[in-house]
């Protein structure tokens, strides 16, 4: 039961918790409050349909690594949706679930992505009558992950006795998450096929490389599958045979800024420092020579 008598009291309590947690984590108070709102929406999604969604993107990394890069989006994959409209309808029903926490999530506007890929939408977070945040949502429907999804507890970013209804969430397979980020790094975009500026994807990949084991054969297959999927949608994606940055002019400064936003990333603050790990991790995946498993302690495939 909600122990707070008014939306104002709840907001004050959330802010007080965020202030306490900011002292422990060093993260900004506003970012911690925003993550609380994201988590309350995710609680609705995975309580309404525990097996119907997979969490992708930056929010999935934050579930895996509490000190990953902060993300202002929620990316969800709906495996059984025959069309984007079906995913949107399922999301609408889940977001409307009343968990008795004084929050409401109001959809405003949605845009179908080309070629049936999914839907983009905005969701306003309401605390009483006050709009406290807006969340960007991507609902994807045409993916084909090869790895096994993971079911893990949703640990509250602001620990407290209430709310106490945190569900398990289902995470998009890590091998496919890696494949998605590698392909996003190297896909070019019109007009003029501008090189990728997805600096944050390299920072995220290096965080994964420092923290997780991965199976070589499955990860290579996932990269090839994701490359084929993007090419079928008209994307210009020619993967290099070895790690390299897409644009040597923009990537040094862009990557440095992205790496600074990942508190858990160790020793990869700039491209010069990051290149040895990026080469050890990515080149064997790109040239297909990776074998066995990735060892994050030894930083090698073996």
Where are the language model's segments positioned?
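Structured mid-to-C-terminal alpha-helical surface segments
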Residues: 1-53, 62-74, 78-302
